[in-house]
């Protein structure tokens, strides 16, 4: 195969991927689709350029328009989140977390964070960003029956351990967490609160989750491509008093060039969220509740039924009694139903290859125009595959043909999965 043929093969594989996504029920809780306007920014000349430092303080020439774009994106973000200070340069949520650890801690400090099986993110653990910073880790006590922080035990542990920082938020994130209660006690011992909003940033932007900044978090980190329907990247919101320190920990700390095409795309997506975010967030959560209820009625062990299942985009099920969960996820994928196996609080952290749980998110389907009635059909497809052992691939593909466009965007109605050729 020639070099040209290999390049064409990659192009064709990418086209195949687009077509597969168009035909699939994507319930991965950490993904989304963007509007055409956002995709155009990602494909712009900015993808070729470099800018180190803050607007007006660049180490490179040729940044006049880049400065203006970044300043506009920051201003839009401050408006959307009502934040004192915003940094849009992290290239991912993990990079945002790492910069926050550098800003608020030093090696050897104690960090309290949620264990991964109980919903925490790996970047809060010693094997990832927290470990890179050289932090000691102690777990935030959780009440697994409600999939949330055990407030009394946590406050007691904060007073006992006197950590330097506490991380709330995570990757299995069904309900708002008690930020204000934790922040009050954190102040007593001089601890700072970092709220990892990677999964729920779009719900916070839509005023439908909680407002961690107002509730007392010192830093809020986020991913810009999960419930927030923007480009791959990260963001940091914080109080003005630590803003410059955070900026310095991003650059030159953990970021050099900050992927300028993604920054411009983030600005466009932020403007869209200011316009459509409330409706989008409302529908995303309504869809999650509807999906959870429909699965529960079909006999699935959906977590937290007595709490209404969820107040976010996520739905979690314990399906261990129905068979090998890893094989189950692969079988669903074969049928164009894409979701992920997930550790649950009662799983060992080393069982990630075959845990008890399945995690789903409704944000991408919501962006495709799904509402509550469609969620019932999604649940039925899942039941037919998992419980009835049916092949529904053709049915799913046919069903998805009515939901190929992007909603909650300035260019609403544009195709969401077409391959853009130049």
UniProtKB/Swiss-Prot annotation:
SUPFAM superfamilies: PLP-dependent transferases (SSF53383). The modification N6-(pyridoxal phosphate)lysine is found at residue 226. Its EC number is 2.1.2.-. Pathway: Amino-acid biosynthesis; glycine biosynthesis; glycine from L-serine: step 1/1. (6S)-5,6,7,8-tetrahydrofolate binds at residues 120-122, 241. Keywords: Amino-acid biosynthesis, Cytoplasm, One-carbon metabolism, Pyridoxal phosphate, Transferase. One of its GO terms (molecular function) is glycine hydroxymethyltransferase activity. GO terms for cellular component: cytoplasm. Gene3D superfamilies: Aspartate Aminotransferase, domain 1, Type I PLP-dependent aspartate aminotransferase-like (Major domain). One of its GO terms (biological process) is glycine biosynthetic process from serine. Its cofactor is pyridoxal 5'-phosphate. CDD domains: SHMT. It catalyses: 5,10-methylenetetrahydromethanopterin + glycine + H2O = 5,6,7,8-tetrahydromethanopterin + L-serine. The record marks 225 as: Plays an important role in substrate specificity. It is found in: Cytoplasm. Belongs to the SHMT family. Catalyzes the reversible interconversion of serine and glycine with tetrahydromethanopterin (H4MPT) serving as the one-carbon carrier. Also exhibits a pteridine-independent aldolase activity toward beta-hydroxyamino acids, producing glycine and aldehydes, via a retro-aldol mechanism. HAMAP family: SHMT. NCBIfam families: PRK00011.1. Homodimer. This is Serine hydroxymethyltransferase. It comes from Methanosphaera stadtmanae (strain ATCC 43021 / DSM 3091 / JCM 11832 / MCB-3).
